[in-house]
Amino acid sequence: MGQAAWGRDVAVSNDIVALRRLINLPADVTSAQWQTGPLAPHGGDWWLAAVMDVPADRLPALLADPAAPGTLTTPPGMVANASFAALKSVPGARPIAGDRLSVPGPLHGIEPFARSPLLQGHALQMSATRLFVVLWTM
């Protein structure tokens, strides 16, 4: 378990059943690790980040088109351990603002995964079979 911002613990989970209760999780996802946390020390806004494994032939169907070049900033308190550590290896990724990462690349929408209240976010293809998705409320 990692220590998140504002003294909260962040655990990485691989419970797909629990993840399905929070977001739309396509049947093509074979495994996932995920974590959640607050966006600020006060208020009710929060985020969910997930690294998902998908068969290579099914991954393109999960990427909302079109991709736009951009930079994804990991949410405050997200712990870059377990499968999340692979974000550090994305070309151009760099640490910013303490525990956060800035990760450049083609960013996709999160329409295939969005479920109220998690309606904002980005998806980033990490490899031929791996996808990083971050969603947040607001």
What is each stretch, according to the model?
Residues 1, 69-74, 127-136:
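Short N-terminal helix-initiation segments at or just after the protein's N-terminus
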Residues 1-27:
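N-terminal low-complexity, Pro/Thr/Ser-rich intrinsically disordered segments
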Residues 4, 44-45, 134:
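Short, low-complexity intrinsically disordered segments
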Residues 8, 52, 130-138:
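Short, extreme N-terminal segment that most often corresponds to the first beta-strand
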Residues 17-21, 33-40, 119-120:
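Short secondary-structure capping micro-motifs at structural edges
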Residues 23-26, 97-117:
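Short, solvent-exposed secondary-structure boundary motifs
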Residues 26-102:
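Mature extracytoplasmic domains of secretory-pathway proteins
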Residues 114-128, 134-135:
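Short, exposed beta-strand-loop hairpins at the edges of beta-sheets
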